[in-house]
Amino acid sequence: MAKRSRSEDEDDDLQYADHDYEVPQQKGLKKLWNRVKWTRDEDDKLKKLVEQHGTDDWTLIASHLQNRSDFQCQHRWQKVLNPELIKGPWTKEEDQRVIELVQKYGPKRWSLIAKHLKGRIGKQCRERWHNHLNPEVKKSSWTEEEDRIIYEAHKRLGNRWAEIAKLLPGRTDNSIKNHWNSTMRRKVEQEGYLQDGIKSERSSSKLQHKPCAAMDHMQTQNQFYIPVQIPGYQYVSPEGNCIEHVQPTSAFIQQPFIDEDPDKEKKIKELEMLLMSAENEVRRKRIPSQPGSFSSWSGSFLMDDNMSNTLNSLDEHTSEFYSMDENQPVSAQQNSPTKFLAVEANAVLSSLQTIPEFAETLELIESDPVAWSDVTSFDISDAAASPIKSTPVKLMRIQHNEGAMECQFNVSLVLEGKKNTCNGGNSEAVPLTSPNIAKFSTPPAILRKKRKMRVGHSPGSELRDGSLNDGGNMALKHTPLKTLPFSPSQFFNTCPGNEQLNIENPSFTSTPICGQKALITTPLHKETTPKDQKENVGFRTPTIRRSILGTTPRTPTPFKNALAAQEKKYGPLKIVSQPLAFLEEDIREVLKEETGTDLFLKEEDEPAYKSCKQENTASGKKVRKSLVLDNWEKEESGTQLLTEDISDMQSENRFTTSLLMIPLLEIHDNRCNLIPEKQDINSTNKTYTLTKKKPNPNTSKVVKLEKNLQSNCEWETVVYGKTEDQLIMTEQARRYLSTYTATSSTSRALIL
């Protein structure tokens, strides 16, 4: 977008300069103008005066209007009230005419261009060109990066849309204003648009100029300083996220601009410096401020070709490589993520060879690289063991040309040995088992921050990771973990017999509980932390003893739901009446469940009597539908009947374990009279099949058996079919079958 100068605005607004008046005279009259807005009455009066006096003498017209000058009257008429003015949309012919006139006169002489367009003023032509007809104007949809720039610029500049438009080439001030008022303001204020990304940038933009000074100071003090800004590459934050707004903004700033405006280039350079200073501030915050301690991050050199290093040279020159601010104290407990500096051999080798110690070391390593790669040849000094108990291990990886061995050097030991004025040149290197060596195809001098996975340390694991053992062995020791052939939950779910379980002392289960932290390879110990001091005691599920729960049976929820659905659909459930007749198998099953023994089986070794188990569970069975009568007549002759009184059997301590109910059959087919109920009951009580059993030594069961036998009389009446309605049905069945027995000798069952 071409810059609009102040002379252009004056040329547009002071169109009278093309007529009878001179600009210097009107500039002096500007002080006398009444800046009050024109009213409708003044507009109507001005129209009438122009119709009467014409547009030749504006001084005469201004004399009829109070507090209005001749220039104001002329400007109001020519710009607003003239009926010949066209205020509607632009036609294609007008747009084509504007394009031709701009190519002829340039994009600044709008009053001259407006004279060739009837009904259009210079302001209309200028806005039409800059907002629509200019080929450099972007008409594509707004991107998120453009929205972010508008949001940040609007916070600093407010509604100065012309200044904001300078930051967005291809976007006009009018389009930016319309985009903000129509879309962005609502999204920012109501929906929180762009709020998350801005919060992370505020901390880096507070100190805009101070990081630059610190950066210059760092560069002058340290000859090994590597510049931060590298075109085409980005940094990786400790959390794994890159500084997202740096890369697109940098690319945007580096793009060429069409307009060669010095002010615009100055603004762009200021923004670029602001961005770089913010980036440096973020980088400086990640670096610990205490030199030599390296308690917050681990440095790693990755070098190729003939590049090697030793701990002697690291002892003397590593602290010089990293220049840090000494004024800000850093706690030893801070553990920032690991930073890795990837350096190519050609970029650093030349500077390292100038140091005598490095040159001698390189010659020694090149002469025998295999010996220098041997891990066991390095020893650790005892002086470096004491001051670094809380310092984490810093790993230094060096890649040799021939051996292709990756070694890890304890940099922190070297630096701590230097602080104690000890010779820390000897340290131990731990070879890595992985043969893969990192290869970098990136340009030299790239500062990278790699992500390092950290696990919460226990007091035992702290010793493994960062501290030294008393014996002087510096190899990293880790407890070997091997897969178990069984599930640990088998032991967690079992409870020893001598341990008393309660709510205060719960048993260990396979479900992890906060506070019970135990490794698989170590024995379990009872925790001594009081219950009220646990971390999330309010959120733990209490251990409930099963003995506390009631012994009453509980109906399952699905069964309750099914019963409720049935009652809702079909009404309340009704008890089904007992059937009138039973088959022999069904009666045997019921008697077996009630008495506990099978009354039809003669077994000598079974107990005399079993206690009643439950109520009648067969009450909900189907109605029995058949009677077998004919077979009973044939079996009657082979059945041995022993008629003895029940009281006599109890005196002899003998119990009936096999009670066979033999129904009364008709001896004569023509017998039709009903048998009295009393006679049937008496005959039934006298008809039993007796089997001798061993006497039961438990006398308490004898009393219980007597009560059961007395209480079962009524029940036996129902079971044996001796109620009134059952006898009626049985007699009717006999009458019905008597007709078949006379004509046919084959027996058949009656299906009711």
Curated annotation (Swiss-Prot):
DNA-binding region: 58-81, 110-133, 161-184
GO BP, sorted A to Z: cell differentiation; male meiosis I; mitotic cell cycle; positive regulation of DNA-templated transcription; positive regulation of piRNA transcription; positive regulation of transcription by RNA polymerase II; spermatogenesis
InterPro entries: C-myb_C (IPR015395), Homeodomain-like_sf (IPR009057), Myb_dom (IPR017930), MYB_TF (IPR050560), SANT/Myb (IPR001005), Tscrpt_reg_Wos2-domain (IPR012642)
Intracellular or extracellular location(s): Nucleus
Keywords: Acetylation, Activator, Differentiation, DNA-binding, Isopeptide bond, Nucleus, Repeat, Spermatogenesis, Transcription, Transcription regulation, Ubl conjugation
Tissue expression per record: Expressed in a variety of lymphoid and solid tumor lines cultured in vitro.
Top-level lineage group: Eukaryota
Residues in cross-link Glycyl lysine isopeptide (Lys-Gly) (interchain with G-Cter in SUMO2): 199, 592, 602
Residue numbers spanned by region Transcriptional activation domain: 230-295
N6-acetyllysine PTM sites in chain numbering: 394
Annotated spans, Negative regulatory domain: 298-553
UniProt name for this protein: Myb-related protein A
Organism in which the protein naturally occurs: Homo sapiens
